[in-house]
Amino acid sequence: QDCSQSELVLDLLEQFLEAGFSKETAIRMINSSLVLQPDARIFSTMDLAAIDLYTGVCEFLKIGSSASFLKKEHGVECIHGYSLPAGVSGQLSLDPFRIRMYDGNLLFMVTDGVLGALPVGEEEQILKDLIGNLPAGTPAEMAERLLEQVEAYGGGTDDMTVLVVGIWKR
């Protein structure tokens, strides 16, 4: 059921954005539809990153989602959101966070299952270390390697997804 709810939220988000709604308006409309469900309370995390390819500015809207990680030339930065999941309350707090990405930066977005597979209290630091020590490769290769390393901890009971996006100058 969680999978079908996630697919519904993703489909709605895509449709609203394709129809020309702003990211914020689309998320607020989805939140309202989840809050007003008559049969059951449905909650959904949303993790949205929009990168302006001309300026390199990445805007994050993190709605109850896990931390993301930005791998730079000299380290890994953790990006948090502090809002509750969509569907919890009619008043959704949207606090966009912007960060400039530069040539060679890599953005790692992970589901809560990835962090949940790591030792409690150390999740983010372990993931930062794993990302920082990943050998160079394509984003797909790096995502696969990271997932394999996290799975080696053996604590995963939830689904795990890793998405890696890179920025390079032409």
Give the residues covered by each predicted segment.
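Catalytic core of PPM/PP2C metal-dependent serine/threonine phosphatase domains
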Residues: D2-H74, H80, L94, E148-M160, ...
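Short, structured beta-strand/loop micro-motifs enriched in basic residues and often containing a Trp
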Residues: A86-Q91
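Intrinsically disordered or compositionally simple regulatory linkers and C-terminal tails
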Residues: W168-R170
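Active-site-proximal, acidic helix/loop segment immediately C-terminal to a metal-coordinating Asp/Glu
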Residues: Q1-A19, H80-S83, M101, N105-T157
